[in-house]
Amino acid sequence: MNCIIIDDEATGRAIISQLCSNVASLNLLEEFSNAIQAIKYLNQNQVDLILLDIHMPDFTGFDFIETLKNPPKIILTTSDSNFAIQAFEYDCIIDYLVKPIAPERFQKAILKAESPPSVKKPSVESSTEKV
């Protein structure tokens, strides 16, 4: 699975890069310190997964997602758990990791990313029609 990291903090990128290197199925293509560089890259390259920090100086992670026409799967990374509810308003966001990220938790998020999307069953409404 081809992935990129977008995080304005060098330490954050290094830690997530190390976590990626421990997952054989991940191919880390690039790391970006800002969303603008990443947008240019995504316009020319195919990516399956974005590991995206929420707090960045030029864009928030949510602002960045809004710029994407067909976003790939996204795992949000942040030191702030306050955005979790907002995160799941986006279909492309498959997980939300709070820093510091435990290796086991990272692996679990990657497994979710690798899983095929679940098919939502239509709800069946029961009608009690009187004849």
Regions found by a protein language model. Name each.
Residues 1-3:
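Extreme N-terminal starter segment of soluble prokaryotic enzymes
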Residues 39-41, 48-121:
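CheY-like receiver
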Residues 125-131:
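C-terminal output/effector regions of signal-responsive regulators
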Residues 17, 31-49:
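Acidic, metal-coordinating helix/loop segments flanking the phosphotransfer/catalytic sites
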Residues 7-8, 53:
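Acidic di-acidic motifs
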Residues 10-30:
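Two-component/phosphorelay signaling modules centered on CheY-like receiver
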Residues 5, 31, 76-77:
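Conserved SAM-binding loop
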